[in-house]
């Protein structure tokens, strides 16, 4: 564990009385680290607890700026979405760390979408989230956003399709659509479900975005084709795949870039 990570983790735990406890199982003493959670590509997260209380402490990456992450916006969105019951309860957040409710359950899989009841529940969660409105925040400019990544790269040898990504971004930017709160990284690993419902986690890439961008990630282009014209759906597909490639390139994982189809 890096010294920075260890320092921030223990500092956050030491200030546990500042957390916003929302249930009867609030700890009487400082929570302790139970285990480091694996699987995340950006940050380092830890399961902590005391007695029946459990939470997740996330230590934010130092590369937040490189990955175009706005931590203040993430916190704003999570606070706004608490009433939907579709996101983990936010207990504490600052620029370096975040503490959220630990959710028992498992992540969604592709096979789960064959379950009509669960599929409908995921759709319902997205509808609840998109129904929450913001005032004066501008919608995401996808061309500017894509260039925030590509401008960091000096070698485009793996990006012969960079022009296609930017054309797709411009197509979406020039479209007539109403922005909604969009997760923008809605991998199955970021959808947890249990007997209480479906929860969307890890909101660090969220912004006001295109209303189909999250549906596309979860349900695929065939689902979206009945909700927009073919040109828009095609542009969203190219854009989403392109942004994923750019993200991996900035991270420096060239193998991952080549393996994305």
Task: Give short role names for the model-derived ranges.
Residues 36-139, 159:
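ATP-binding pocket architecture of kinase catalytic cores
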Residues 159-163, 247-261:
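ATP/Mg2+ or Mg2+-diphosphate-binding catalytic cores
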Residues 27-35:
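Conserved N-terminal boundary motif of the eukaryotic protein kinase catalytic domain
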